[in-house]
Amino acid sequence: MLGFLVLP
């Protein structure tokens, strides 16, 4: 869900 983090 978050492009700048590991989360999608």
Swiss-Prot record:
Keywords: Toxin. Processed by the macrocyclase-peptidase enzyme POPB to yield a cyclic octapeptide. POPB first removes 10 residues from the N-terminus. Conformational trapping of the remaining peptide forces the enzyme to release this intermediate rather than proceed to macrocyclization. The enzyme rebinds the remaining peptide in a different conformation and catalyzes macrocyclization of the N-terminal 8 residues. Signal peptide: none annotated. There is a cross-link at M1-P8 (Cyclopeptide (Met-Pro)). The keyword Nucleus does not apply. One of its GO terms (molecular function) is toxin activity. It comes from the Eukaryota. Cyclic octapeptide that belongs to the MSDIN-like toxin family responsible for a large number of food poisoning cases and deaths. Cycloaminide B is non-toxic to mammals but shows immunosuppressive activity, probably through the inhibition of the action of interleukin-1 and interleukin-2. Belongs to the MSDIN fungal toxin family. This is Cycloamanide C.
